[in-house]
Amino acid sequence: MTATMYEFHLPQVPSRLTARYHPRSPELQGLGGAWARARLPFSDADDEHDFLQYACLFPCLVWPRATFDRMLDLCDLSSVVSRIDDTLPNPGDVGRSEAHATAFARELGAALSGREVPPGQEPGYASALSDVWGRIAGKAAPGVRERLSVSLHNLFRSFVAEVASRRRGGFTDLADYVELRAHSVGAQLCSAMAEYGIGADLPDSLFTDPEYTRLQAAVAEHLTFVNDLFTFAYERHRGEAMNAVLILCGDGRAALQEAVDTVLGRIEAAELRFTALRDRLLARATAASQVEPYLTALADMLAGNWHWSRTSPRYHGPGFVWNPLTAGTVTLRPGGSTSFTAARHPAS
């Protein structure tokens, strides 16, 4: 990325989805923060403080209809996955080699099996995962438990693939990147967590339906590009390469505004595909199938991730408070923080 890439215009993006918070968000944030503080490793007090600022905001936005007892599990599982994701770009941690990442993924997989967690580089993550997985496995219906387990194992494998890609210098082709991120962005896991949260047990026929397969692809693309739109300043500061905006801007292939506009176009196209496929699936659903509340939960998830990505201190810097503008000028500041102003687009 060149030295001139410090500012871009964010237009008003039309959305057909509405974000909402879980009605017991303050209580969940307190309980989830206490669990994360006790169970997860942090590098220092500042690291812990910064993480606990937003530890449960993401799950409270993306699964707002989950029952309270299951929402506690979702908060804790989300915290584990988020902290693991933070370790991957660190060359002094599990990200220092594909072999280290593979060993770490095996350790995490063992935590899902009920076996004793073996010693490893970050035993805190595996033991925390074992704790929350034990609770989830005891409540989930067999099919839901299997979908959660498969999606977690797939996520761990994608973490290894991400580390391997970083070691090779990252991606230069957007299509290859999107293919990997279809797994590593956690869309499959987030969807299974949505099913668990509302207490559904969906029919197997849904998961073999071609229209549902296409809907899941739209979910993954929406999550990926929304994340990348709002996180690239943060990820650039961390020396990251796993971001669509950074890939499009690499080696001067596109100016920042052009890259942002491309990503915004992909977000809007993914949302249009999602809503069209959702409506077709709803037209065929029966009340007994539980498909309608599940698809509503997926729509909540996309809207919540959009709001979270726009407003989170995780991506915009400690202490960030949203103004709350949804369009205007986004300024990238030294240290990876951002600010939003209502300045007119230079071309307008």
PLM features: what roles do these ranges have?
Residues 1-348:
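Alpha-helical, largely C-terminal catalytic domains
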